[in-house]
């Protein structure tokens, strides 16, 4: 049966939505299928909060999943809109919000369709572990750029397309240690920092920073690193602010 969002943006793969929807029941379990994501979340939040004053800020979380980062941002005082195309995950996020008392505006919506509504621009947009799961990641970056206010920042995390990433993020994580279900990632969809930088430039954004992010399964913790050969975070700013500070 066609989904309700088949009428709107086509920049998704149904197989990807189904894959992550299967994790719904354990999304908020720190020892469940999303265990690595729980470890990454404090690092992602710290990276964002050091670059944006979150209290009172309008923040968009693109591909929010079950709401781990969305709630963390809202706890810092941000007014968070969180979008995802998996209805099961949005339902799980809303239910957890009822339990935690944290208010987030969760929507089953594609970013292209949010853009068409011409909402008030955002101070910050987070797009975490999402670009490698869509057919046209450059289009997502472009839509994000159009939704940022002058001086707003876009935060992205993804996986580099390197041999090290294939061996650790695919072979190691999915087949050896089994931290993730088999088929979670496709190597061909990984994104090199230079590719991301080109998309950001084309969208009119200025790349401020690229930092490596490393997950240590034996300690179940994550940290920033100078190495960007596997996971990495990036921050880009709208051109008005970058020009004003030159």
UniProtKB/Swiss-Prot annotation:
<keyword id="KW-0949">S-adenosyl-L-methionine</keyword>
<keyword id="KW-0489">Methyltransferase</keyword>
<comment type="function">
    <text>O-methyltransferase that catalyzes the 2 O-methylation steps in the ubiquinone biosynthetic pathway.</text>
</comment>
<dbReference type="GO" id="GO:0061542">
    <property type="term" value="F:3-demethylubiquinol 3-O-methyltransferase activity"/>
</dbReference>
<protein>
    <recommendedName>
        <fullName>Ubiquinone biosynthesis O-methyltransferase</fullName>
        <ecNumber>2.1.1.222</ecNumber>
        <ecNumber>2.1.1.64</ecNumber>
    </recommendedName>
</protein>
<dbReference type="GO" id="GO:0010420">
    <property type="term" value="F:polyprenyldihydroxybenzoate methyltransferase activity"/>
</dbReference>
<keyword id="KW-0831">Ubiquinone biosynthesis</keyword>
<comment type="pathway">
    <text>Cofactor biosynthesis; ubiquinone biosynthesis.</text>
</comment>
<dbReference type="Pfam" id="PF13489">
    <property type="entry name" value="Methyltransf_23"/>
</dbReference>
<feature type="binding site">
    <location>
        <position position="44"/>
    </location>
    <ligand>
        <name>S-adenosyl-L-methionine</name>
    </ligand>
</feature>
<dbReference type="InterPro" id="IPR010233">
    <property type="entry name" value="UbiG_MeTrfase"/>
</dbReference>
<dbReference type="InterPro" id="IPR029063">
    <property type="entry name" value="SAM-dependent_MTases_sf"/>
</dbReference>
<comment type="similarity">
    <text>Belongs to the methyltransferase superfamily. UbiG/COQ3 family.</text>
</comment>
<feature type="binding site">
    <location>
        <position position="84"/>
    </location>
    <ligand>
        <name>S-adenosyl-L-methionine</name>
    </ligand>
</feature>
<dbReference type="GO" id="GO:0032259">
    <property type="term" value="P:methylation"/>
</dbReference>
<dbReference type="GO" id="GO:0102208">
    <property type="term" value="F:2-polyprenyl-6-hydroxyphenol methylase activity"/>
</dbReference>
<feature type="binding site">
    <location>
        <position position="63"/>
    </location>
    <ligand>
        <name>S-adenosyl-L-methionine</name>
    </ligand>
</feature>
<keyword id="KW-0808">Transferase</keyword>
<feature type="binding site">
    <location>
        <position position="128"/>
    </location>
    <ligand>
        <name>S-adenosyl-L-methionine</name>
    </ligand>
</feature>
């Amino acid at each position: 049966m066609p989904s309700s969002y088949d009428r709107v943006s086509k920049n998704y793969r149904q197989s990807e939505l189904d894959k992550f929807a299967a994790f719904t029941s354990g999304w908020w379990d720190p020892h469940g299928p999303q265990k690595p994501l729980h470890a990454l979340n404090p690092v992602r939040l710290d990276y964002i909060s050091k670059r944006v004053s979150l209290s009172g800020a309008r923040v968009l979380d693109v591909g929010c999943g079950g709401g781990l980062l969305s709630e963390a941002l809202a706890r810092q005082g941000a007014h968070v809109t969180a979008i995802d195309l998996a209805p099961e995950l949005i339902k799980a996020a809303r239910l957890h919000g009822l339990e935690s008392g944290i208010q987030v505006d969760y929507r089953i919506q594609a970013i292209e369709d949010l853009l068409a509504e011409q909402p008030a621009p955002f101070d910050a947009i987070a797009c975490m572990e999402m670009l490698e799961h869509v057919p046209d990641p450059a289009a997502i970056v472009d839509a994000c750029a159009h939704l940022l206010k002058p001086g707003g920042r876009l935060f992205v995390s993804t996986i580099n397309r390197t041999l090290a990433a294939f061996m650790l993020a695919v072979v190691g994580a999915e087949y050896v240690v089994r931290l993730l279900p088999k088929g979670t990632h496709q190597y061909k969809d990984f994104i090199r920092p230079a590719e991301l930088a080109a998309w950001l430039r084309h969208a009119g954004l200025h790349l401020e920073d690229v930092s490596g992010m490393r997950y240590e399964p034996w300690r179940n913790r994550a940290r920033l690193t100078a190495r960007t050969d596997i996971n990495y975070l990036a921050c880009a700013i709208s051109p008005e602010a970058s020009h004003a500070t030159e």
